Amino acid sequence: MGYRKLGRTSDQRKAMLRDLATSLIVSERVETTEARAKELRSVVEKLITLGKKGDLASRRQAAKTLRNVEILNEDETVQTALQKLFGEVAERYTERQGGYTRILKVGPRRGDGAESVIIELV
């Protein structure tokens, strides 16, 4: 199975996908290019599957990918992206067997004409 290089070295590509995956878990929708979104989809699908398992090994595996970002909820409680993945997001998809994300085309980006899309959690 191949992957997209996205014009970056492997460590830069891994860092970019970690940032995008964390942003998608936190805000539940991200606007990016089509190639990045298609690569991000596979990363996030695997993370949500780990979240559904819920055991300690899965939590540690997901912690290697997600950034340690804190989220302030409406009720003034602080939650990390990892806690949101294993709590709120995993509960939402207990009955769903994959296909956790949706990619919507927005059109070409103004600066360089790259195809822009919105990737969001279903």
UniProtKB/Swiss-Prot annotation:
Q: Which InterPro entries match?
A: Ribosomal_bL17 (IPR000456), Ribosomal_bL17_sf (IPR036373)
Q: Which GO terms describe its biological process?
A: translation
Keyword annotations from UniProtKB, A to Z: Ribonucleoprotein, Ribosomal protein
Q: Which domain of life is it from?
A: Bacteria
Instruction: Tell me which family the UniProt entry assigns to this protein.
Output: Belongs to the bacterial ribosomal protein bL17 family.
Q: How does it assemble?
A: Part of the 50S ribosomal subunit. Contacts protein L32.
Q: What is this protein called?
A: Large ribosomal subunit protein bL17
Organism of origin is: Staphylococcus saprophyticus subsp. saprophyticus (strain ATCC 15305 / DSM 20229 / NCIMB 8711 / NCTC 7292 / S-41)
The gene from which this protein is expressed is: rplQ
